[in-house]
């Protein structure tokens, strides 16, 4: 069982479908997630095609990390279906293709042996493991890992130990690891967490190149900060809480002052999604949203 009550499933089923279905990297259909009796997420629908660059955006505590667990094969829904790279969550061995999914997340960072060399942590993406164990890697593998470390400004970390890294250093190691195996689906959960201004801008510059690349790789960047969205990402799924009659329907499953379940309230392009009115409603605060020089920002009014 993973943190937050998510149980990792080991099985997937292969999907047979139309050419349109074969172009889909990720699809969530009426997904609901419950922890004990409480409904955390409900009516979550999302379709990400190959080659698309998405931002999953929303406040803290809305359920973004729970969705990341499902999208990365490390958790499954209470109801609904999750299809990943042509496989349905819940039915086929995930370890045969988990290395096709690149993941960077704080929870994954805690899974490595404390004394692991960051360079070794990066190459383990090729075997979808969190430690070298008995696996062997080639000189070419290490050369690629070192190239990624240079791109994100952390080449000086080679030879150090994971448990001695700062939060920002560990975050950049995990981004490098997520890119190491040239994944078909790349999931970056809060990729600038713990970075200072310089480190953040280095990371965003590198991630902008990921957003601009022309390939079949689908990318999902998860964040709650507008200013940390790199250029090149042109789709957004905005999360909020269900309201009105829908919220009333879940009242029995909301204990005390617990909030209403989270869901996706908007999918589409960033320009139509990131409006002052919409984000004010999502965050419960009057906000002014701006966009200049390819970067988004928001402030209270």
Where do the protein language model's features map onto the residues?
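Conserved ABC transporter NBD signature motif
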Residues: 80-90, 97
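ABC ATPase nucleotide-binding domains
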Residues: 269-301
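ABC-family P-loop ATPase nucleotide-binding domains
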Residues: 108-164
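The feature captures the beta-strand-to-loop junction immediately N-terminal to the Walker
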Residues: 57-59
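Catalytic Walker B motif of ABC-type/P-loop ATPase nucleotide-binding domains
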Residues: 186-190
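Helix-to-loop junction immediately C-terminal to a conserved catalytic motif
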Residues: 72
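H-loop/switch region of ABC-family ATPase nucleotide-binding domains
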Residues: 223-224
């Amino acid at each position: 069982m993973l943190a937050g009550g998510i149980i990792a499933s080991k099985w997937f089923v292969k999907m047979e479908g139309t050419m349109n279905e074969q172009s889909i990297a990720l699809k969530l259909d009426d997904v609901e997630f419950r922890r004990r009796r409480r409904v955390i997420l409900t009516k979550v629908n999302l379709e990400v095609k190959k080659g698309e660059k998405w931002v999953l955006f929303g406040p803290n505590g809305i359920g973004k990390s729970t969705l990341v667990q499902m999208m990365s094969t490390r958790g499954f829904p209470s109801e609904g279906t999750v299809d990943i790279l042509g496989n349905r969550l819940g039915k086929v061995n995930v370890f045969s293709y988990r290395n096709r999914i690149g993941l960077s997340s704080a929870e994954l960072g805690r899974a490595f042996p404390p004394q692991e060399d960051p360079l070794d942590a990066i190459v383990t993406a090729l075997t979808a493991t969190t430690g070298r164990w008995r696996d062997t890697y080639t000189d070419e593998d290490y050369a690629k890992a070192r190239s990624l470390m240079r791109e994100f400004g952390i080449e000086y970390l080679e030879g150090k130990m994971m448990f001695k890294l700062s939060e920002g250093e560990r975050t950049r190691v995990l981004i490098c690891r997520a890119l190491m195996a040239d994944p078909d689906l790349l999931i970056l959960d809060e990729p600038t967490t713990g970075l200072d201004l310089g480190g953040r801008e280095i990371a965003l510059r590198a991630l902008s190149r990921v957003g601009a690349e022309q390939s079949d790789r689908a990318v999902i960047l998860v964040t709650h900060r507008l200013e940390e969205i790199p250029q090149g990402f042109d789709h957004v799924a905005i999360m909020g809480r269900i309201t009105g009659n829908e919220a009333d329907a879940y009242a029995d499953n909301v204990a005390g002052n617990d909030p209403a379940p989270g869901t996706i309230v908007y999918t589409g392009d960033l320009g139509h999604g990131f409006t002052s009115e919409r984000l004010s409603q999502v965050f419960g605060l009057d906000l002014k949203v701006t966009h200049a020089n390819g970067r988004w920002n928001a402030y209270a009014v």
